[in-house]
Amino acid sequence: MNIHEYQGKAVLRSYGVSVPNGKVAFTVEEAVEAAKELGTDVCVVKAQIHAGGRGKAGGVKVAKNLDEVRTYAESILGTTLVTHQTGPEGKEVKRLLIEEGCDIKKEYYVGLVLDRATSQVVLMASEEGGTEIEEVAEKTPEKIFKEYIDPAVGLQGFQARRIAFNIHIPKELVGQAVKFMMGLYRAFIEKDCSIAEINPLVTTGEGKVMALDAKLNFDSNALYRHKDILELRDLDEEDSKEIEASKYDLNYIPLDGNIGCMVNGAGLAMATMDIIKHYHGDPANFLDVGGGATAEKVTEAFKIILSDKNVKGIFVNIFGGIMKCDVIAEGVIEATKQVGLELPLVVRLEGTNVELGKKILNESGLNIVAAESMADGAQKIVSLVG
């Protein structure tokens, strides 16, 4: 789960991480009032959407007086920002962060991520702050420094100091930088983050180390023990189909293709997408109905797939281990009738009660194309979609 920058900064502040003072605003008048309350000579007006690249898209403006705050708030609120992370459709700006300006001396990057290769959290840092870390990794990888963190003991002070020296934090500010990184790590662990990224981390003319931006992502599977974080969820920033899918415990991720996929199990779902691509098709989604799919869940899965106007056909690929193929077959038939499906539908069943499942499909009288294997099903749906 993602949260907004201002929410992430509030979380980090509670862990002793230094961030600029700021206030969220939902209207132009609130933005002006927030700037008044901050009482600083310079304010930064920042669009709040779940995407990076806001500055390049015109979503971050420096205001030197209240009139400029009003002008920038009017120009940003309600507009659609298109960045490299939003896709061509962009995201509408519904809230702003009004923040005090900083006398920036130098920008850095600091982030915590999970390294799946080592099964450890890794602290990454670079003196090339303010730019995409992927770009730094591609062009100047030698400027990225890493510290792998033993989960048994956590981030150690010497590791944070080594990072600070490697990225050339001024010696007199190393102590602050170490405190910053230790606080960031505590937030990452205690709040079950999957990413904690500060870009940029800055040193200021006043001799401070601060987070000028904050990106926190959380492990959705751990949200049951973080009610405070769950309350920060902004449904306006999420795909409506993903929200609907979550209501029925369906794992749905939209893609750009035209072949809808309904599969049980994440591994089989990925294999299904791969084989569709192998036969020159394009999957429209990843949809895992899980191990205990009912007729209701199958029906809802169909509705979610069909809500994507790009879908021209559906491939149902089920291995009946925990669930039974006859139950899935009945669910597919019920769903087909309920939604009045007119698109090509290919169904491949294998596993428990597979013969009964196939019999139910064959005797349904519906235009359902049966497949004998995953490859057969992929070829058939690609051919039918054209």
Swiss-Prot record:
Binds 1 Mg(2+) ion per subunit. Its EC number is 6.2.1.5. Substrate binds at N264, G321, I322, M323. One of its GO terms (molecular function) is magnesium ion binding. Its cofactor is Mg(2+). It holds the Pfam family Ligase_CoA. One of its GO terms (biological process) is tricarboxylic acid cycle. Keywords: ATP-binding, Ligase, Magnesium, Metal-binding, Nucleotide-binding, Tricarboxylic acid cycle. One of its GO terms (cellular component) is succinate-CoA ligase complex. It comes from the Bacteria. Mg(2+) binds at N199, D213. ATP binds at K46, G53, R54, G55, E99, C102, E107. Succinyl-CoA synthetase functions in the citric acid cycle (TCA), coupling the hydrolysis of succinyl-CoA to the synthesis of either ATP or GTP and thus represents the only step of substrate-level phosphorylation in the TCA. The beta subunit provides nucleotide specificity of the enzyme and binds the substrate succinate, while the binding sites for coenzyme A and phosphate are found in the alpha subunit. This is Succinate--CoA ligase [ADP-forming] subunit beta. It comes from Bacillus cereus (strain G9842). The gene is sucC.
